[in-house]
């Protein structure tokens, strides 16, 4: 139960960091919706559903493993169920900045590209991008769909594991503003070499599960992330594989601050039902959600689409479609998978 006094002209969203695995949500007896997948965020607008006094929130969660699910019934990690990441109320203006992207252009260390997307009735607005340390200030105007893109010449200090440089980035519309810490780097391959900022890098790393350091349960906080990553740092790592599912946002951001390259993965694990269309749609949705949340995290260099999946033609089609989807959403980062020997 909770009470909330919403300011006139504002909108309110109920955000879940993650719920494992199937979540059905009601507010004040009204069915808000259903979410499948235990490792990505989702939200509902509740602006017009609030009571003046006490509000009642009910979440029904089922973490039962199913053969057609992603992951499937056989996976070698603890299947912690329930609400595993923070639940928050987010108040927004009537027209707000729904999403944005700010990174280096592909293979160009001197060009920052990006876009912003507004949501609401007043979609045509002036947008200001401000990166004070780089003396970058760019104004663009969104179109009738609330979208605007930009391309800016600049020479930022490039993010590396040795110098994980991040810049304060501010985006402001006429009705909303957001701030972020963003790093800039290029990533590509040349034969069998991985090139970070056009220099070959050797990735020294380990796999980490999203489990609390000192007791049983899902890790979810900045402190959890810092402890786990500090142990990786003690081992001499510059790279972590966040296995085998999208980890919480605190983990990804702390890894970025601490100088860890990241392999980020969806739980297409072992014996997925390759022929099942719903299974594919589930996997693709988790991939899209992972990329949408973390597209501005420069330390992520690999979107991983699978782990140790037995060879078959149906698997090849399934994974090829996922790889193509990832490339359609992100033409810069590498696409990978951990494969069984074939």
Which functions belong to the PLM regions below?
Residues 210-214, 269-273, 305-308:
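A short, mixed-charge helix-start or loop-turn motif at secondary-structure junctions
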Residues 340-342:
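Substrate-binding cleft/loops of secretory-pathway carbohydrate-active enzymes
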Residues 289-314:
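Active-site groove signature of glycoside hydrolases
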Residues 207-208, 266-278, 326:
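Substrate-binding/active-site clefts of carbohydrate-active enzymes
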Residues 220, 278-282, 314-318:
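Alpha-helix N-cap and loop-to-helix initiation/capping positions
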Residues 1-254, 258-262, 286, 301-302, ...:
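Secreted/periplasmic carbohydrate-active enzymes, especially glycoside hydrolases
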Residues 240-248, 272-274, 280-281, 310-313:
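Acidic-and-aromatic substrate-binding clefts and catalytic sites of carbohydrate-active enzymes
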Residues 275-293:
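Ligand-binding grooves and catalytic loops that recognize ribose/phosphate and carbohydrate rings
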């Amino acid at each position: 139960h909770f009470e909330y006094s919403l300011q006139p002209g504002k909108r309110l969203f109920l955000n879940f960091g993650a719920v494992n695995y199937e979540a059905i949500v009601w507010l004040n007896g009204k069915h808000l919706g259903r979410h499948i997948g235990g490792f990505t965020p989702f939200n509902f607008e509740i602006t017009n559903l609030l009571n003046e006094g006490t509000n009642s929130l009910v979440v029904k969660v089922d973490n039962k493993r199913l053969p057609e699910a992603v992951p499937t019934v056989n996976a070698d990690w603890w299947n912690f169920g329930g609400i595993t990441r923070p639940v928050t109320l987010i108040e927004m203006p009537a027209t707000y900045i729904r999403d944005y992207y700010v990174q280096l252009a592909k293979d160009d260390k001197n060009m920052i590209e990006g876009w912003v997307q507004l949501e609401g009735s007043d979609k045509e607005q002036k947008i200001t991008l401000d990166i004070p340390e780089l003396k970058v200030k760019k104004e663009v105007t969104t179109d009738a769909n609330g979208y605007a893109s930009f391309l800016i010449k600049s020479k930022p200090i490039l993010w590396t594991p040795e110098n994980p440089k991040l810049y304060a980035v501010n985006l402001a519309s006429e009705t909303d503003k957001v701030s972020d810490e963003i790093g800039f780097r290029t990533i590509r391959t040349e034969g069998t070499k991985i090139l970070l900022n056009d220099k070959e890098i050797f990735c020294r790393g380990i796999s980490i599960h999203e489990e609390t350091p000192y007791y049983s349960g899902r890790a979810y906080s900045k402190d959890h992330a810092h402890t786990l990553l500090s142990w990786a740092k003690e081992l001499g790592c510059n790279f972590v594989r966040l296995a085998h599912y999208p980890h919480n946002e605190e983990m990804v951001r702390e890894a970025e601050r601490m100088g860890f390259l990241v392999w980020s993965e969806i739980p297409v694990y072992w014996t997925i039902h390759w022929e099942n269309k719903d299974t594919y749609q589930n996997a693709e949705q988790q991939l899209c959600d992972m990329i949408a949340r973390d597209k501005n995290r420069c330390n992520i260099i690999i979107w991983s689409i699978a782990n140790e999946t037995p060879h078959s033609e149906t698997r090849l089609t399934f994974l090829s479609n996922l790889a193509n989807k990832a490339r359609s959403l992100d033409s810069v980062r590498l696409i990978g998978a951990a494969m069984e020997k074939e």
